[in-house]
């Protein structure tokens, strides 16, 4: 599934939650040399329990608003976020 993601880079702590149909993800890394994007992919795979190689940024590589491809459906996404 593709999901809209808003990334807040340089946050004090990592966080992931749904805001409507958009996933809000806070990462510690600054948006320099792709570090925040790498942390985003790593964090999504860790929290959702999917392989890192199966998570990809489809659009918005250099924008805080991104489209990310993840190999689970919306119901599973909501369930995994609620379990945290």
What are these regions (language model features)?
Residues 1-3, 19-23, 51-53, 64-66:
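A generic structural signal for short beta-strands and their flanking turns/coil linkers
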Residues 1-16:
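Charged, low-complexity intrinsically disordered regulatory segments in eukaryotic signaling
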Residues 5, 44, 55:
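Residue-level signal for inorganic ion chemistry
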Residues 6-8, 19, 26, 58:
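Solvent-exposed beta-strand sheet faces enriched in polar/charged residues
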Residues 9-11, 20, 61, 72:
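A generic beta-sheet turn/junction motif
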Residues 10, 49-54:
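Short amphipathic beta-strand starts and helix->beta connectors
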Residues 15-48:
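Compact, glycine-rich, soluble single-domain proteins
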Residues 52-84:
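C-terminal structural segments of small proteins and small subunits
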């Amino acid at each position: 599934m593709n999901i809209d993601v808003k990334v807040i880079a340089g946050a004090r702590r990592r966080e992931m939650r749904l805001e409507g149909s958009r996933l809000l993800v806070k990462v510690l890394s600054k948006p320099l040399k792709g570090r925040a994007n790498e942390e985003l992919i790593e964090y999504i795979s860790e929290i959702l329990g999917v392989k890192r190689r199966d998570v990809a940024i489809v659009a918005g590589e250099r924008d805080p608003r991104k489209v990310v491809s993840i190999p689970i459906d919306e119901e599973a996404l909501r369930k995994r976020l609620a379990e945290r």
